[in-house]
Amino acid sequence: MRKLYCVLLLSAFEFTYMINFGRGQNYWEHPYQNSDVYRPINEHREHPKEYEYPLLQEHTYQQEDSGEDENTLQHAYPIDHEGAEPAPQEQNLFSSIEIVERSNYMGNPWTEYMAKYDIEKVHGSGIRVDLGEDAEVAGTQYRLPSGKCPVFGKGIIIENSKTTFLTPVATENQDLKDGGFAFPPTEPLISPMTLDQMRHLYKDNEYVKNLDELTLCSRHAGNMNPDNDKNSNYKYPAVYDYEDKKCHILYIAAQENNGPRYCNKDESKRNSMFCFRPAKDKLFENYTYLSKNVVDNWEEVCPRKNLENAKFGLWVDGNCEDIPHVNEFSANDLFECNKLVFELSASDQPKQYEQHLTDYEKIKEGFKNKNASMIKSAFLPTGAFKADRYKSRGKGYNWGNYNTETQKCEIFNVKPTCLINNSSYIATTALSHPNEVENNFPCSLYKDEIKKEIERESKRIKLNDNDDEGNKKIIAPRIFISDDKDSLKCPCDPEIVSNSTCNFFVCKCVEKRAEVTSNNEVVVKEEYKDEYADIPEHKPTYDNMKIIIASSAAVAVLATILMVYLYKRKGNAEKYDKMDEPQDYGKSTSRNDEMLDPEASFWGEEKRASHTTPVLMEKPYY
């Protein structure tokens, strides 16, 4: 056994040595061999013909008689551009004795910055109507909000009513339309609760006491158990009012209820179910709608403020371009544009309901037009025997660009991958606050990324291995826009970007290898697809040291396990008592049938089929 241990240990050390130092080959001799990215262009010339031979031009690398072959010359760039203003010395990323090759890798410098605008990923549920999860209460399944980001400015409008949705729900002998959506009064009071009251209530709770006000409000609402069912994972939503610093727990999770089958807009019929819908309204601009799943770090990962001097775009091989296919609407201001985006955003509202005709009208129209399906739907309404549990997962028209000059709101459903610097635009999302704006466009992002990529690439090539003329070779990334035009190394004179508050320059004479399709999808051009067939979508990291450390640690762990095993073999094996198996705790009642009851528990004795069902909407009695 000891011999086996020694053999395994020696093998482990040999494996570690191979990872760190290889088997004698010089990695730097072939820096692009077996590489998926950053390969020099040998077959495709990305520059116009007049720039293929920079030695024939006025500005060169001071190597007129160097005798370089054509393959080397086609990658060279003139150092100074005719008519270009020289950049300050500290901003010039290249020296005059360097040969520049252009990378093939079409990376996106905006990836990290734009992560919070990937709403499908960061929010993961509906926005206009959020019913993204199901939970069981007292043996019955209900839907509930589940979005991971706050929805700023969202509220509920009760149709034809002076009652606001933050009014406590009607209880006992009250008429239905006398109440709203909020939790009824309790002793002690749990809703509404001020920020100071919540801080005091949770002052000894290490997990809650230091949370921000929105997350604290969400967790406070999540502490309430419906119907005293402690086994239920149903959690109430909440609304936080920034103006008075109050957290309102919502007893009703439904956010939309329309149609003559489900509600009555007649205000005089006080005890009939009211109609309601979600909205971003002037009355709600201080409100924030919260689900049980709001993440603790929402300020970092979720959008809140709108972006001034910016418009959402798509990153297309070196530059951020306009989204070509959008839906355009008129909007007097940013608030109206944000409201429009919200109305068209991702929604979990069920689709199977009739929101216009009453049962009598449907029967009448059915006989008149000999439409049997219409007559059938009056007696057997859609949803009565089949629950419509549509979940958007955050997919929808969640983004918009507002043009302050033309007063047009451009709305689209494709995830933006970059920002365009434009003084006439404000970028907004359905999650964002309808009014709040920030003006901090990252003007240095491109220049910083160019520098970072060159430094990263320098680890893969020998910068000190100069050619006969003392020239160094660097690999420049495919970024063709920057506030430092010298960093672009453009074969033509870069153009100034109009309406740019960052004073950007763009290089337009380099052929693009990608394009945008009719459905707003960025794809590699046909002539370059073979070259990019084996390149992964995501840029690999070059932090080889992390891989080495991880591999070494794994080998060390293996060696330690072997040592412990051999040590234990020397003596008698110790006997360990098995932990007692956990006792069966109370479990919520499970349903054997998959066809859940789709009828809403609307207030009153009669149950009606509803498109909002199954949502917990029971009248509380005391």
UniProtKB/Swiss-Prot annotation:
It comes from the Eukaryota. Residues 568-622 are cytoplasmic. Residues 577-607 are annotated as: Disordered. It is found in: Membrane. Keywords: Disulfide bond, Glycoprotein, Malaria, Membrane, Signal, Transmembrane, Transmembrane helix. Pfam families: AMA-1 (PF02430). Disulfide bonds join 149-302, 217-247, 263-275, 320-418, 337-409, 443-502, 490-507, 492-509. Glycans are attached at residues 286, 371, 421-422, 499. Residues 25-546 are extracellular. The chain crosses the membrane at residues 547-567. Residues 1-24 form the signal peptide. It is a single-pass type I membrane protein. SMART domains: AMA-1. GO terms for cellular component: membrane. InterPro entries: Apmem_Ag1, Apmem_Ag1_dom_sf. The keyword Glycoprotein applies. Belongs to the apicomplexan parasites AMA1 family. Involved in parasite invasion of erythrocytes. This is Apical membrane antigen 1. It comes from Plasmodium falciparum (isolate thtn / Thailand).
